[in-house]
């Protein structure tokens, strides 16, 4: 009872403090108190509810039966919208604060909200090596189920709360992407409800134009209601090698070399300064040396990026065996390194042992309680960006990131980009090795001004035929956006499928003016 009483006393004192100082002041200057006392317990309740629900639904096999009825309900909503005169654009009815994007779309308030309650794993077919899922299924659900039966996704993006729909309509990447590509490249079929209320299934051989146009389209070609995704046999552990590298030229050469080696199942780099990095390569295995086993996902363990940094500080190479699911979600507890700005003492051993089992807070709840003042502060003094550039431009790109924003650590993740139709493809006719450069944190460049600095970075990315992930703040104008992305197939399908009066253009959903 004593911990519960202590927590209750702390909560009471916090409420008195809020009454004295005002909620907005506390949310800005003592945000960690609010997060620890309220958001962490709420996040834990959310996680337990959705995990139990997903397990029960799948075990009782009710999801496929309910799925068809739910799809018919979506079709009915779309047809009713048409009968009422199609006066506004449509969008999903999922609240903007529930998405992993740091911003909330303004269009939710003005568009017709179509309710899409599709959050179940429908089928796992180990003979065809396919999992069929609904769009709101999360990566946490997928790993919990698939790893328990000995399977996994070839590309399993990091954070637990990322949804299949978001990873298809936006994009997704992981340290296995140098072998398999982006999340869209492991998908074999999409099922959608179109602007006229009709249902369509598309694959590389059936309705192929739509299949290739859907990724990155942000729900502007139709409503995704299911997807089929490749699965591969899983092993128990990842045998992970840590290699500190110094000197930018050496870092780029080593990272490029490891990314080209297909025997590496996983390749990842953490750049701690322009001249210091740790490059990690891993392979799946069923055997582990007990003395080198590291269950990094346990709540009391150090945050992964801090653990990796120790290899740099001590200038030594390392070898560890990490349980597969722990590896997949190695950055989840610290939200990469974003949590250190929210709970500055979050990696302290005492905090980890006492409260680490509640970490991390839900990104959706952090957004919901952000407030306008804090949102503006984040916009001007915080960067969250993923830029995808050709591997051959890595050294030039890192210099540009250093000069324009100066944020560290930087996440480095290689991926192969096939030459396929759609919004995103290489400049030539052959597949090309690209890299995701992820910058998350407070810029340390002098006189940082969000708009001008980000526009400068976006200009560089366009110049090397790179791409910007669309969850992030986009400062490009429409012309610049379509210079970055190939809209030929996308615009053709929008006209063919009657999307122009049903859905906004993708730029109008992701541009800076469309979000707050």
UniProtKB/Swiss-Prot annotation:
Compartments (UniProt record)? Endoplasmic reticulum membrane; Golgi apparatus membrane
Alphabetized Pfam families for the sequence: FAD_binding_4 (PF01565)
Which ranges sit in the Lumenal compartment?
Answer: 23-31
Occurrences of domain FAD-binding PCMH-type (ranges): 58-234
Task: Name a GO CC annotation attached to this entry.
Answer: nucleus
Q: Which residues lie on this side of the membrane: Cytoplasmic?
A: 53-516
An example GO BP is:
steroid metabolic process
State the protein's purpose: Catalyzes the reduction of the delta-24 double bond of sterol intermediates during cholesterol biosynthesis. In addition to its cholesterol-synthesizing activity, can protect cells from oxidative stress by reducing caspase 3 activity during apoptosis induced by oxidative stress. Also protects against amyloid-beta peptide-induced apoptosis.
PANTHER family, alphabetized: 24-DEHYDROCHOLESTEROL REDUCTASE, DELTA(24)-STEROL REDUCTASE
Subunit comment: Interacts with DHCR7; this interaction regulates DHCR7 activity.
Name of the featured protein: Delta(24)-sterol reductase
Give the species this sequence originates from. Homo sapiens (Human)
Organism placement in taxonomy: Eukaryota, Metazoa, Chordata, Craniata, Vertebrata
């Amino acid at each position: 009872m004593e911990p519960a009483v202590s927590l209750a006393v702390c909560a009471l004192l916090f409420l008195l403090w809020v009454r004295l100082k005002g909620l907005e002041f506390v949310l800005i200057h003592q945000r960690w108190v609010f997060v620890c006392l309220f958001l962490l317990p709420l996040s834990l309740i959310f996680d337990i509810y959705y995990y139990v629900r997903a397990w029960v639904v799948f075990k009782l096999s009710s999801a496929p039966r309910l799925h068809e009825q739910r799809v018919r309900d979506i079709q009915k909503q779309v047809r009713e919208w048409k009968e009422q005169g199609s006066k506004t654009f449509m969008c999903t009815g999922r609240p903007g604060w529930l998405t992993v994007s740091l911003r909330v779309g303004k269009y939710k308030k003005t568009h017709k909200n179509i309710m899409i309650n599709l959050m179940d794993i429908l089928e796992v077919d180990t003979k065809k090596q396919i999992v069929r899922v609904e769009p709101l299924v999360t990566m946490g659900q997928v790993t919990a189920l698939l790893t328990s039966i000995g399977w996994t996704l070839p590309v399993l993006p990091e954070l637990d709360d990322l949804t299949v729909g978001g990873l298809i309509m936006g994009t997704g990447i992981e340290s296995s992407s140098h072998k398999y590509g982006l999340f869209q490249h492991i998908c074999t079929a999409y099922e959608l409800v179109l602007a006229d209320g009709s249902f369509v299934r598309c694959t590389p051989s059936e309705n192929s134009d739509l299949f290739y146009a859907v990724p990155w389209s942000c729900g502007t070609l139709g409503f995704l209601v299911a997807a089929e995704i490749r699965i591969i046999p899983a092993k128990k552990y990842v045998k992970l090698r840590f290699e500190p590298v110094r000197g930018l030229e050496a870092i780029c050469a080593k990272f490029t070399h490891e990314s080209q080696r297909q025997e590496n199942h996983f390749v990842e780099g953490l750049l701690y300064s322009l001249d210091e990095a740790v490059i990690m390569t891993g392979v799946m295995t069923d055997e582990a040396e007990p003395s080198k086993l590291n269950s990094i996902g346990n709540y009391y363990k150090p945050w992964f990026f801090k653990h990796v940094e120790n290899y740099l500080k001590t200038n030594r190479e390392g070898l560890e065996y990490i349980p597969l699911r722990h590896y997949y979600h190695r950055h989840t507890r610290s939200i990469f390194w974003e949590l250190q700005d929210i709970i500055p003492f979050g990696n302290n051993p005492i905090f980890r042992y006492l409260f680490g089992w509640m970490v991390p807070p839900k990104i959706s709840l952090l957004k919901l309680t952000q407030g306008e003042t804090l949102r503006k502060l984040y916009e001007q003094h915080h960067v969250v960006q993923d830029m995808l550039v050709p591997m051959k431009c890595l050294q030039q790109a890192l210099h540009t990131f250093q000069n324009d924003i100066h944020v560290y650590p930087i996440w480095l993740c290689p991926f192969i980009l096939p030459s396929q139709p759609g919004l995103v493809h290489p400049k030539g006719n052959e597949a090309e090795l690209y890299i995701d450069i992820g910058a998350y944190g407070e810029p340390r460049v002098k006189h940082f001004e969000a708009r001008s600095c980000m526009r400068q970075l976006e200009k560089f990315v366009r110049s090397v035929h790179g791409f910007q992930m669309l969850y992030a703040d986009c400062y490009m104008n429409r012309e610049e956006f379509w210079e970055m992305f190939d809209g030929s197939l996308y615009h053709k399908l929008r006209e063919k499928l009657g999307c122009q009066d049903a859905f906004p253009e993708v730029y109008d959903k992701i541009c800076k003016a469309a979000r707050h």
